[in-house]
């Protein structure tokens, strides 16, 4: 069937900011889809609110709108652009929900917009729990015993019929938002009320738990001629009961018999045909390990996290082909881009094993609730490819960057066996490592199986890993055993530990005896057809398939899994760097291990190595490819941390030299530089012990900011007010040492300013200066940033420009530099300097049309900025006002305090742009999920130090018609100024404020921290209750002021004469 000619313009909806459950996989899918549609000759309009994505680059679509993904804003774009069609299945759950809302409100019909791909009725049939269950019953496909509820009372009725445990699944949500497993009445009440709150349809499915069944997924494709294929099937190592995004996954499935595999394959295809899916679709099934009984759990009628994994696991580009199916092409007429000879209707075959392990944020949120269930908690994931299951698992473990390199914990010896077993009996993010620890202590596999329900096949593989450890210990230095361990994915570091050698000695031993990996191609067809994809993985076998060319090469290190503090912004920079390398005539090679991203799409670079980002794995590639040099400044802290180790092997680090990278991080050297170039910084010292830190603080004066050196995303950073807090920090939060000193700085309150610049060694260009709305002390990644600055004087701007140029030249920066300043009462001070790409690079690149990462890469190759037409200093300002607003995923993470401080907590960002600051802020806040209303009720409970400041704020909110609730202390302060406020009781008292929040009486909460334990606990409960009820809670008065400005601009002020 030829493609459709009756449509010319297609609107694609992106997935918005990165949140838990919806990460970079949709940037990858959206980018592929837009390019595929353009390739077929359609005009593509894209709307997405996330500026940190490749898909929002002007080259990807014909028109790009970075606007909030709400019904009203998309409706405006539809009315303005008049597209012929809308493709909603590539923007995750956000895109689907938007399509449904636009359909129901009549916007699509009024503007003659057709929906492409899967029909709306099919989407609703798959997403609406009631309709789905009915369809399954008609098809005779078993679903778990279940009931649809719209109220908590109905849930209790169902519980009386079937008993516990019960699984709650809210309709039309993603990442399991609001869902969970209930074991008792209290949990049932809490989870169902939460689920009804998060479901746009106020509907939950309650099902009898089948926890303990195997969880199997099939990624399938279908076209309008009813051709349907299975792209990939995957098995969750964790049994049913843990969200698939939080499960360790293997592809292809390892424990199914052929009969089981074919049975589940047939069911998956039967279901997608019955639903009439056109495009990609993910089917999740549960299989009883002891019989042929199975249940269908759910169907996602769209491109998903699993389809990104399936695409990277097989090399089969699901999103690209799904977009083409949506415009009428069929599987049997599209070539498979990997082989270039076989058609897309051939099912991929794998001759390797894939392991995916989720990346959790608990290294940042140590107090977070770690227990895993049906609600997703991982921020990202890693994937590894091997020829044995053990090899792929161990490669994936060392890709995670938890400081864990093997199946066990660094301090594993210190736990007693009872504690280890206790940890295994709970499903959490560390269970895998505790299982390794238990096997090491001789626990039987039977006992572990009974505790976890993990299939014996996998437990035997874990046992094999531990057995090899013992063999290495018994045959220290034996080459046969070294080779054998390498076949099963052991790292040099792990072998060194068992051989009683250093990692470097094991590396040298391998080199002398020619024990090196070869690189195999990922070709979708197990080498049955000719294939020329430049997509490789390393393994210890004989034949190397990665042909080294004569061209000069540059190797770019990616940024690994998405986590808080290191998001998709770094992938954006990596991709742009690769494009610049290719334009300059070099061969570009990427090393990365994140299956969700654009950088690991094999069509982006000349060669892609899907490998862990460790010294050993990267050196193996460098030894084969012998690149001109390695670029580390675009891969976040992951890549920067490898620079030292690679340089020791004689590898050339391109761009800013290693010595200068270290000068920016080393306290004493950096201070010496600042004195030399005459740039002030807050008074500070470094401490290598608690005693030294106390002496430093006494000299500098409280409050002080304390943090470890060499970290990203402000990990373990705190503002402390006295000796007791400082002692606490030094003994609990960090292990200070001469190699890793702790920095103690004077805490200056003032405006925080962020600047990104590019330097070629001679010229420094500054694309833009951003002002933060929150004063210094809130991590820059969690602050609202505004471009251009709104409140700075000409003198301050000139000083910022001068200091930035001095710093970039003083550090001999070649490439990018990011600097944070604070403007305090008496001048501009530099807070920190990062000699690398930063979180704000995509944001500024979009605003100014200056392709910052590409210019930086060209400077690294040796081109001059003046030859490219740029003058030194701040570049001309773009028209309009732009804000970057942070987006948090607190509703997915229990027990995490949402107070903003120097440690980063946001998972993503949105951009708001308009002609005035208030309008841009309105868009930024709306896009980040804060509903801005021009009237309502605000609850204020602030610490004593903020009471004076909150008066003015209360007065303004009162004048625009907001009703004020306040706790007694705050209310008394407001009464002094004749501002009316209703007094609410403290937690547990009369007219308790938590009850008022839960009853929906409050639209905004303003709550600032009070130090001191009891109050902190109250404050923590208040903040968590707001999150669980979906109410914006502002913990910084600066954010509250900005929101008030927006409210004032939307409404009229009522003041008596």
UniProtKB/Swiss-Prot annotation:
Residues annotated as binding Mg(2+) 3: 820, 832
Gene Ontology cellular-component annotations: cytoplasm
Chain residue ranges for the region called Carbamoyl phosphate synthetic domain: 547-929
Annotated residues for binding of Mg(2+) 4: 832, 834
Reaction equation(s) it catalyzes: hydrogencarbonate + L-glutamine + 2 ATP + H2O = carbamoyl phosphate + L-glutamate + 2 ADP + phosphate + 2 H(+)
Positions with a binding annotation for Mg(2+) 2: 298, 300
Metabolic or biological pathway: Amino-acid biosynthesis; L-arginine biosynthesis; carbamoyl phosphate from bicarbonate: step 1/1; Pyrimidine metabolism; UMP biosynthesis via de novo pathway; (S)-dihydroorotate from bicarbonate: step 1/3
Keywords: Amino-acid biosynthesis, Arginine biosynthesis, ATP-binding, Ligase, Magnesium, Manganese, Metal-binding, Nucleotide-binding, Pyrimidine biosynthesis, Repeat
Oligomerization domain: annotated span: 402-546
Protein name: Carbamoyl phosphate synthase large chain
Species of the source: Staphylococcus aureus (strain JH9)
Lineage, broadest ranks: Bacteria, Bacillati, Bacillota, Bacilli, Bacillales
Gene name, Swiss-Prot/TrEMBL: carB
């Amino acid at each position: 069937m030829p493609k459709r000619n009756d449509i010319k313009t297609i609107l694609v909806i992106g997935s918005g900011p990165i949140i838990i459950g919806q990460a970079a996989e949709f940037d990858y899918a959206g980018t592929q889809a837009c390019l595929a549609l353009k390739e077929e000759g359609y005009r593509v309009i894209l709307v997405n609110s996330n500026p940190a994505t490749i898909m929002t680059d002007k080259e990807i679509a014909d028109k790009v709108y970075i606007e909030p993904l709400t019904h009203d804003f998309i409706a405006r774009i539809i009315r303005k652009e008049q597209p012929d069609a809308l493709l909603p299945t590539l923007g995750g759950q956000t895109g689907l929900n938007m399509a449904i809302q636009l359909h129901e409100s009549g916007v699509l019909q009024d503007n003659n917009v057709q929906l492409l791909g899967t029909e709306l009725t099919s989407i609703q049939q798959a997403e609406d729990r009631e309709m789905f269950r009915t369809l399954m019953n008609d098809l005779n496909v078993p679903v778990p015993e279940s009931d649809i509820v719209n109220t908590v009372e109905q849930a209790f009725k169902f519980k009386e019929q079937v008993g516990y445990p019960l699984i709650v699944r809210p309709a039309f949500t993603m990442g399991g938002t609001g869902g969970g497993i209930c074991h008792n009445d209290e949990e049932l009440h809490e989870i169902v009320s939460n689920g009804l709150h998060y479901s746009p349809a106020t509907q939950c499915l309650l099902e009898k738990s089948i926890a303990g069944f195997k969880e199997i997924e099939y990624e399938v494709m279908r076209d309008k001629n009813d051709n349907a294929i299975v792209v990939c099937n995957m098995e969750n190592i964790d049994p049913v009961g843990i969200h698939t995004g939080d499960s360790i996954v293997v592809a292809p499935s390892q424990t199914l018999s052929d009969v089981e595999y074919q049975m589940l394959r047939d069911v998956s295809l039967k279901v997608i045909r019955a639903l009439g899916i056109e495009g990609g679709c993910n089917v999740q099934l549960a299989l009883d390990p002891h019989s042929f009984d199975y249940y269908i759990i759910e169907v996602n009628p769209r491109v998903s996290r699993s389809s990104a994994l399936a695409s990277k696991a097989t090399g089969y580009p699901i999103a690209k082909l799904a977009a083409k199916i949506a415009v009428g092409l069929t599987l049997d007429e599209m070539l498979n881009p990997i082989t270039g000879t076989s058609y897309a209707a051939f099912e991929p075959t794998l001759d390797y094993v894939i392991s995916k392990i989720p990346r959790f944020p608990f290294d940042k949120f140590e107090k977070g609730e770690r227990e895993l269930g049906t609600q997703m908690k991982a921020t990202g994931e890693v994937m590894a490819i091997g020829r044995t299951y053990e090899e792929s698992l161990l490669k994936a473990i060392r890709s995670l960057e938890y400081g864990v390199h093997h199946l066990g914990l660094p301090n594993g010896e210190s736990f007693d066996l009872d504690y280890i077993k206790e940890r295994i009996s709970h499903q959490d993010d560390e269970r895998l490592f505790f299982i390794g620890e238990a096997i090491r202590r001789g626990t039987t596999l039977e006992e572990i199986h009974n505790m976890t329900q993990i299939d014996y096949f996998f437990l035997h593989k874990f046992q094999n890993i531990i057995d090899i450890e013992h063999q290495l210990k018994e045959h220290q230095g034996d080459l046969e055993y070294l080779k054998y361990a390498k076949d099963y994915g052991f790292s040099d570091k792990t072998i060194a530990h068992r051989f009683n050698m250093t990692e470097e000695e094991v590396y040298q031993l391998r080199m002398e005896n020619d024990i090196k990996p070869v690189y195999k191609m990922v070709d979708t067809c197990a080498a049955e057809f000719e294939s020329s994809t430049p997509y490789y993985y390393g393994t210890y076998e004989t034949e190397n398939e990665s042909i080294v060319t004569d061209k000069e090469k540059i190797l770019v290190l990616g940024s690994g899994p998405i986590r808080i503090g290191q998001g998709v912004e770094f992938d954006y920079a990596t991709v742009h760097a690769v494009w610049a390398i290719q334009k300059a005539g070099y061969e570009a090679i990427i090393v990365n291990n994140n299956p969700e991203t654009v950088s690991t799409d094999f069509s982006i670079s000349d060669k892609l190595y899907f490998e862990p980002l460790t010294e050993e794995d990267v050196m193996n590639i460098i030894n084969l490819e012998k690149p001109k040099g390695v670029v580390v400044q675009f891969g976040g802290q992951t890549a920067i941390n490898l620079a030292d180790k690679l340089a020791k092997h004689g590898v050339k680090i391109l761009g800013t030299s290693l010595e200068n990278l270290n000068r920016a991080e080393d306290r004493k050297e950096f201070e010496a530089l600042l004195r030399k170039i005459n740039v002030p910084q807050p008074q500070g010292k470094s401490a290598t012990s608690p005693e030294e830190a106390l002496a430093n603080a006494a000299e500098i004066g409280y409050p002080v900011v304390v943090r470890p050196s060499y970290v990203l995303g402000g990990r373990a950073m705190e503002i402390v007010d006295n000796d007791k807090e400082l002692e606490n920090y030094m003994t609990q939060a960090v292990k200070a040492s001469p190699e890793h000193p702790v920095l103690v700085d004077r805490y200056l309150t003032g405006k925080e300013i962020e600047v990104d610049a590019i330097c070629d060694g001679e010229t420094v260009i500054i694309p833009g200066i951003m002002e933060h709305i929150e004063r210094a002390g809130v991590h820059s990644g969690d602050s609202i940033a505004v471009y251009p600055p709104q409140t700075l004087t000409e003198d301050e701007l000139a000083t910022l420009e001068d200091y930035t140029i001095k710093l970039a030249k003083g550090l001999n920066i070649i490439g990018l530099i990011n600097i944070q300043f604070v403007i305090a009462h008496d001048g501009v001070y530099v807070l920190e300097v990062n000699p690398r790409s930063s979180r704000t690079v995509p944001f500024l690149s979009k605003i100014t049309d200056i392709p910052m990462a590409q210019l930086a890469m060209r400077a690294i190759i040796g081109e001059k900025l003046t030859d490219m037409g740029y003058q030194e200093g701040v570049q001309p300002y773009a028209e309009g006002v732009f804000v970057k607003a942070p987006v948090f995923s607190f509703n997915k993470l229990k027990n995490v305090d949402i107070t903003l401080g120097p440690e980063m907590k946001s998972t993503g960002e949105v951009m708001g742009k308009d002609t005035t600051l208030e309008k841009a802020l309105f868009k930024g806040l709306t896009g980040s999920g804060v509903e801005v209303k021009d009237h309502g009720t605000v609850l204020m409970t602030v610490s004593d130090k903020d009471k004076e400041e909150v008066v003015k704020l209360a007065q303004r909110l009162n004048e625009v018609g907001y009703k004020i609730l306040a706790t007694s202390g705050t209310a008394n302060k407001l009464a002094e100024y004749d501002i009316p406020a209703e007094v609410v009781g403290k937690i547990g008292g009369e007219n308790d404020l938590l009850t008022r929040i839960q009853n929906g009486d409050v639209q905004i909460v303003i709550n600032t921290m009070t130090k001191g334990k009891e109050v902190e606990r109250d404050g923590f409960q208040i903040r968590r209750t707001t999150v669980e009820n979906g109410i914006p809670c502002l913990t910084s008065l600066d954010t509250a002021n900005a929101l008030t400005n927006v409210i004032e601009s939307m409404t009229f002020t009522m003041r008596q004469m």
